[in-house]
Amino acid sequence: MELEEEENPRKRKETPNSALTTELDRPSWDVQDPEPQAKKARLSTILFTDNCEVTHRQLCELLKYAILGKSTLPKPSWCQLLHQKQLNNVVVFILKGMSQLHFYRFYLEFRFLRKTFRHKFSLPPPTSSFLFDIIGLQKKKSARGCPRTVEGPLISATLKSSIDLQNDPIIQKYGYKNVSLTRCLLTKEEMKTFHFPLQGSPNCENFILLKYSGFITDSSPLFGLDCEVCLTSMGKELTRISLVAEGGYCLMDELVKPDFKILDYLTSFSGITKEILNPVTTKLKDVQKLLRELLPPDAVLVGHCLDLDLRVLKIIHPYVIDTSLLYIGKQGRRFKLTFLAKVILGKDIQCPNKLGHDGIEDARTALELVQYFLKYGPKKIAEFNLEALAANQEQGNKEGATHMRSVLECLDSMGQKLLFLTQDIDELSSYRNCQTVKCSSNKEVLEQARVEVPLFPFNIVQFSFRPFPPLFAEEMKNNMKTRWTEMSTIYAGPFSKDCNVGSLKKVFSSLGPVQSITLVLETYRPYFSIQYELLEAAQLAIETMNGTILEGSCIRVHRLLTELTLECDTLVRELEQDSENQGTIYVAGIGETFKEHLLEQSNLFPDLEAVILPKELKSRKQKNYCFLKFKTFNSAQVALEVLKGKDWKLKGRNALTSRHLQAWLKNIHPEPSMPMGLRIVPPLLERHIFRTLKANHPKIVAWRWSRRIEKLYHSLSPGTFCLILLPGTKNTFGSHPGLGLMKIKEEEGGDTLL
């Protein structure tokens, strides 16, 4: 479950709650500055989702908030930016052509980035409009089109002639004729794209599956669903569920008591207060059980941004209709429920003079929107011209800045300009408040940045690099998977020939999840190859088991030395010192009561920010390890000694792998996927390329530009919000996700985690 700021609206975000883990960065209402007069801007990530992926729209959300602040905009949904007014300026470095694969393949070379930027997250592969998605820069359109600019007038919604039905996204998806209920259901691929919980997904181990049949028809019943949440010490938890049947009849409207201490009731959005929730005894498990009893096997759940509701409920259901996607706008725009209710149904909901949302009203509204769509069809919806209506509403709104969709518009509203330094501007439109400087090389971009960046409140500094050739990228990706597998595999022995294999498995499994134990047949005395799920477990086995007496034998525990593990010790050491892993410890051998025991003795673990407790995929049983994240490195070390002591008798060590890295490694496919029928001349393989390290080799490029960005970073003034984006790559042969790193620069010497 993710922790969000007190004023973050539940339905404003795109990234779902984490079902497995939570980062409990100290929220703004719990931060006490030792000297109130010395407030500083600070970042506090919430570790967003299970794979720590942040969408491009969410990046834009954060950047807009960095410019305008909470007086005009809602707070970001996926992280906390504390004391935004103390920011001096914003600098976004874009390393075009680089991806998460670059960063972890050349992890040792990116020394400055990994040691300095504590907050890292995955990015989806870039679209063709990457800059537009995060900043508001738009590619030039053909002469037949009408390019939209910051200065350009907004289209009038009252002119029927202005409606372009053919290019309306609803028409493009559904056509002109009325559609059936089953046609409106989200496909499995769409559910995956929009982060719905799915059976078998690594982030849904502890979710329950609602009963469902393999047959669904156009007569299957619809049920409107809406949830409200609060913020607790374990993140975001359910406080109210509303379920409505067709006809508007309310089947369920239950208050729910969270399992953990409530930090913020989010009353302005949920309407829930301490007094309301105090007498409640209903728990999440009770709601889950009731849903399984109430809903028939062919039930279709309907909601607005329904993925968020399902995740907070920790349920999986294959039959869903999401009104934010049913009434989709251009470029994937998702309209607010209040807007659709007013335009389509002609009614006002979530009135500003009313405290909190009415869950029944929201669920009923979503249900009515689906029924309207089914009755009148896509053509009728397209004729509303939702894009134009929304644009007019935003233009006429006195608080229009709240609805601004681009960073450029936010800057323009404050009379400020954006500086854009790049080699590639030919395909971009010009904007009155964007000063673009075209450079001939990355080196010139760097030189211009040193001079120009201090003069502008918002800066985009884009360096361009040649992406990896497809086959080279595939080989590197496969090598990465192999390297981590080999690093997570240990060899233990020799044992006696009559050793108890079950006993050995139990001993080694106590250090972390084991994927396989294999008897090595090439040795005279038995050795075992043990592959762990986590690098931490393998490293812990080497550190604690090597040289011990087991089954009557003194054993050696070590890794196999291969080309890919030659620098394993160095890599482990550097991973341990990664700023994201500082303050995080890995603990093995825990039982089901560990969490309760931990909370009961919380006084022994000051500065505890996160408890990460993964569960088994099928049984939903808690695994025998966890990660504990602390505010400081010192607090983590104190806690580690306590947990390894005589009272707790657990084993552990400093963390090595962040959650986004674990998720990325799991998703690396071993075989390349290429279009059929294409004959490709393979480039030189990686091992041959590395024999001659030329100046433009990726390894040298990574090292050189990490150093150059370091120098540029140190030239920035304190209070600068620095965001580094490796956007990822996307082409005919496949895609590679990107990586984001962010930090607010402090005074020199104050940037390290103590």
From Swiss-Prot:
Region Disordered, residue ranges: 1-36
Keyword Repeat among record annotations: yes
Domain Exonuclease positions: 222-370
Matching InterPro entries: Exonuclease_RNaseT/DNA_pol3, Nucleotide-bd_a/b_plait_sf, RBD_domain_sf, REX1-like_exo, REXO1/3/4-like, RNaseH-like_sf, RNaseH_sf, RRM_dom
Gene3D superfamilies associated with the record: 3.30.70.330, Ribonuclease H-like superfamily/Ribonuclease H
Signal peptide: none
EC number(s) from the headed UniProt entry: 3.1.-.-
UniProt-recorded name of the protein: RNA exonuclease 5
Source organism (scientific name): Rattus norvegicus (Rat)
